[in-house]
């Protein structure tokens, strides 16, 4: 994320003039109710973390289980879990070594050979009806050049494919073989793990260090001319390198597991208006010019499935006003899936979190938020967990449907039945769930209505459970209260089936 290991250059972002004016197009919803469909994510960062390396596998399982439980209670429905912070792995991999942030030493496996953190997190999220997005950093290899790499690391085999910039080490983005290797890592994850998405954040070309050019002369001289770029077009060439990677990752995912999404969380400013008349009324570092990340192109071309810009600034910030940027992204995302990255600490310090969420919900094309950073929810920083649960997420929400990937509906559940046993009262149903067929039912939504209440499946407050199971345990309320329960199926793309209903007395 933009806070972790950022070079000191970042004073470059705190700039000249107060943002003023509004974008030409302001699109808002006519009314804002509690949304039934809303992305509610939390980033779980592993880079720079020391908490895991002091845990054995049993302790880590308990910690992960409690993490997912607490996030679920706060209304989070998608966990973005960092599994590749430094060309390493929080999962079993034959391509890259175990992460030092997991066990303290790169290449050292967990004490329990059967423990796979990514697989465990997927299971914990899915059993609660939540998504797991596997978060990868594409180019970074070392956050500090003095860090030791495990034997057999790809850098040890091909040091010529890497460059040092400042005090860090990176894959050279200009080399085709590096793009292929990164895609091989993606293919390995998607083929072996039921991740709901592959996620990358704002780290493409590294954040610039004042007075220090990025050392890619060698790859530029090797490839630029043959790719149609002149010596004066190095910026365009760098953008093309990242474009090629993003497109190749998308095709890799689509060819491996078509239901898996690809999401990007870019830095919050695409371009400033002073550099581009279509840019935002801001004065800060830019995706396009400084990180060589043309996020608008990726959205327009359909190379990514969701865009999650990090709008971490305060409302009224002099260089990058939150509200100005929110309106700009709302008007410049080609009506595709758009979520907003929120900084919990900065927002709470300014007493702005609820206002920011309300503003995001007023936007026509914004359909969710993601919180940086997730550990603050777990630690209940300034009471944020309770605020999310009670004030911001008082009702459950389903992930927005990715109809551009598949727009059919799964079959409705059948034989919705009330079952009594000696010690349990529950609903059960049949379905056409097939794990290898993502267009079939993958999880189920349970709604509850009072017996005289109108059945309206658009009311988020009537959702009482999202589950992968084909049963739901019913509460006991004295035996004289009448309800209507409704069950629907969701496919892997979030499309919802027709409802099945049953009348009950609890």
Predicted features and spans:
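Active-site-adjacent "subsite" loops/lids of carbohydrate-active enzymes
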Residues: 37, 45, 49-62, 134, ...
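Catalytic domains of carbohydrate-active enzymes, especially glycoside hydrolases
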Residues: 62-89, 192-195, 297
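Aromatic-lined carbohydrate-binding/catalytic grooves of carbohydrate-active enzymes
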Residues: 75-112
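Aromatic- and acidic-residue-enriched segments that line the glycan-binding/catalytic groove
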Residues: 89-104, 140-166, 202-227, 273-285
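Active-site neighborhood of glycoside hydrolase catalytic domains
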Residues: 177, 181-185, 191-200, 204-281, ...
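Substrate-binding cleft of secreted/luminal carbohydrate-active enzymes
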Residues: 292-318, 329, 334-405
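Pro/Thr/Ser/Gly-rich low-complexity, intrinsically disordered linker/stalk tracts
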Residues: 387-439, 494-506
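Beta-strand-rich modules
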Residues: 474-496
